[in-house]
């Protein structure tokens, strides 16, 4: 359970790239609400899938289509915002609060993130033991802790990266690369879902 949770949480994805970029631009402290929202949002998604939502998806598979489309739109929007970011690194100057990702955006991003749904459905299938819900409760608890720590590590990495990117146009170039990557990841996940 720990290895599965770690491999899914620490591997690059839309949420991780958003945390990396936000922490580079605004610091971990400013990004912490987004990290918390993403962790709690995913934990609620995982618990919902573990304890019944999976059956609803089996009955109404079109729900995954809707989630994939909405998720792609959300990820494209976030990617465009990162792409257009000025490329400033952490400073003592006041931040533009409107550009710092919020708790709600973190939670919503997980519910609309195809990678999160894949992790939730795969983990539920892997660790489900029939009618013994205690195993799934342990899985959800382990995933919560591992997810929080993994996302926090991405935030710390972004903050550390800021010192390297504080020269010339490196921060702006980094935002362009991260924005383009997030856009490409979201389009690729949508493409793979509909045309695999």
Task: Describe each PLM feature range.
Residues 6, 10, 44, 80, ...:
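Hydrophobic/aromatic residues within the transmembrane alpha-helices of Major Facilitator Superfamily
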Residues 1, 5, 38, 106-110, ...:
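Residue-level signature of transmembrane alpha-helical cores of multipass secondary-active transporters
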Residues 29-102, 157, 187:
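Membrane helix-loop-helix hairpins that form the core translocation module of multi-pass transporters
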């Amino acid at each position: 359970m720990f290895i599965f949770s770690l491999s899914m949480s620490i591997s690059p994805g839309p949420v991780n790239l958003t945390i990396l970029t936000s922490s580079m631009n605004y610091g971990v402290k400013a990004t912490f609400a987004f990290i918390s929202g993403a962790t709690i949002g995913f934990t609620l998604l995982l618990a919902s899938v573990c304890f019944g939502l999976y059956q609803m998806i089996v009955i109404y598979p079109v729900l995954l289509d809707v989630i994939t489309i909405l998720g792609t739109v959300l990820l494209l929007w976030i990617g465009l915002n990162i792409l257009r970011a000025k490329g400033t690194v952490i400073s003592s100057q006041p931040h533009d609060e409107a550009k710092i990702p919020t708790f709600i955006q973190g939670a919503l991003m997980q519910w609309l993130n195809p990678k999160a749904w894949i992790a939730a459905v795969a983990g539920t299938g892997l660790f489900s033991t029939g009618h013994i819900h205690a195993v799934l409760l342990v899985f959800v608890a382990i995933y919560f802790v591992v997810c929080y720590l993994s996302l926090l590590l991405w935030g710390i990495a972004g903050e550390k990266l800021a010192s390297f990117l504080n020269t010339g146009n490196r921060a702006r170039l980094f935002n362009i690369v991260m924005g383009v990557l997030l856009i490409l990841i979201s389009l690729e996940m949508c493409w793979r879902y509909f045309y695999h």
